[in-house]
Amino acid sequence: MEELDELAREAGELARPLNGLDPTTFPSIAAMERDIVGFMRRTLHGTGSGLLRSPVVGSVTSGGTESCLLAVKTARDLWRAEHPELARRLAREGRRPRLVTTTLVHAAFQKAAKLFDLEWDPVPCEPDGTAPASRIVDRLDDDVALVVVSAPTYPSGIIDPIAEVSAAARRLGISCHVDACFGGLALPWWPRVEPWDFRLRGVTSISADLHKFGYAPKGVSVLLHRGRRRHRAQFFATTSWAGYPVVNPTLLGSRSASPLASAWAITKRLGHEGYASLTSSCARSVTQITQAVASIPGLTIWGNPTGPALALIADESLPAHEWVDPHHLADEMVRHGFRIQHQPGSTQPDGARLPHSAHLTITPVTERALPEFLAALEQAADAVRGTPRAEARLELAALTALGFAPRSVGGRFRMPSPSVAWLILRVAGVNPGADSLPGRLAPLMTLVERLPAPVAEALLTELLARVSEP
């Protein structure tokens, strides 16, 4: 991996003076983007005789969030163009076209719905993290601008029922996007994966990050579309001002070419064989971790993930005194030199709960440290086994008394101002400065989970804002 890092640094440095705003001024930018899009098109089965009438084309973006935003914006614009009367009727009724996803879809799609004036319509998942295809398909109607399925979902590592949903979307004339930002450069070489990409005719667009399992530096992703018309709807163009004609394929205007150049160099160096080898390393690590977790009492893997991500949860089939709480486990792992990611549980729109968990992303680097990691995992589990879920009783009592948390389910609550939010965070153990988080995050995660979502979001906004505030 060090060799790839050095290659990325050298390529990025060579492209540092270039501006991706205008590839006609810097033809090398167009050449590199063309090569990357071509590589991804081949990888995701976007070539072949069946695609001649609707060729797969696309763009390089600044990251997964931008790819997801553009996928939603494109689908919305096409829906408006194809359903003008329905769009006007919904507007008169104070309604908006819908964006259908599962509750485990990446948060970027919530952001997209908010930015592009769509109604986010999340479909609840089962407790094991799966989303029944019938449940998603039942939400599809003529007011749906886009349905999104994930390969895989980030929180659980589980692949959505893409074949069934995309087929239904195609029958109904609805755009279907596959968010493969996480798995787009791992699943093509992962063992025993059912088709999820452009082999499925109902898939109209796919996002895939090159800065994850493409091993490029941060800031480069790809959005592919089935058909030129769909791709061109992604663009912004105007001649209605006194300056130069503006044509932006993505949300950004000026763009650094360094991430593009680094990604181009790495895809050229690795090729399909190199990616297959690195993916095999990830798969071996996942197999060993899965086997190790199965031997740790009180701990289990959430659902049945496919790919280089998985989440650990308490094995609640055992008595409570044998449970290994994943957030206590994550805190304890820090003492052993490893960081795994706390994920709070959540209540879905139908009232069903999704468990709190600890997320693991497995990379080729994992295999080198796997013996130490597995030993640390076992020791950390032994240390916290039977420890009850972290509480935030004092903080919750204070917030309830002040009106920032409801006294009953569905009750009213107030929103904290920035100063009050910061005071609450200080009480919860957050410190000023860049090293702001408390040593153990389990209590803070409990607080985040049990507060009304708008209040928790206000607290987290304040935390991040204070980190960089002068």
Where do the protein language model's features map onto the residues?
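Active-site C-terminal subdomain of aminotransferase-like
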Residues: 192, 196-322
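Surface-exposed helix-capping loop/turn segments at secondary-structure junctions
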Residues: 42-52, 81-86, 293-302
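Non-catalytic terminal extensions of PLP-dependent enzymes
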Residues: 1-34, 38, 42-44, 49-50, ...
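Generic structural signal for well-ordered, non-membrane alpha-helical segments
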Residues: 25, 29-33, 64-68, 102, ...
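Short Gly/Ser/Thr- and Asp/Glu-enriched loop/turn motifs at secondary-structure junctions
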Residues: 53-55, 94, 303-309, 353-355
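Conserved PLP-enzyme active-site core in the AAT-like
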Residues: 59-249
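Hydrophobic, well-ordered secondary-structure elements that form the walls
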Residues: 179, 206, 282, 333, ...
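Predominant activation on well-ordered alpha-helical scaffold segments within soluble catalytic domains
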Residues: 33-41, 69-76, 110, 163-166, ...
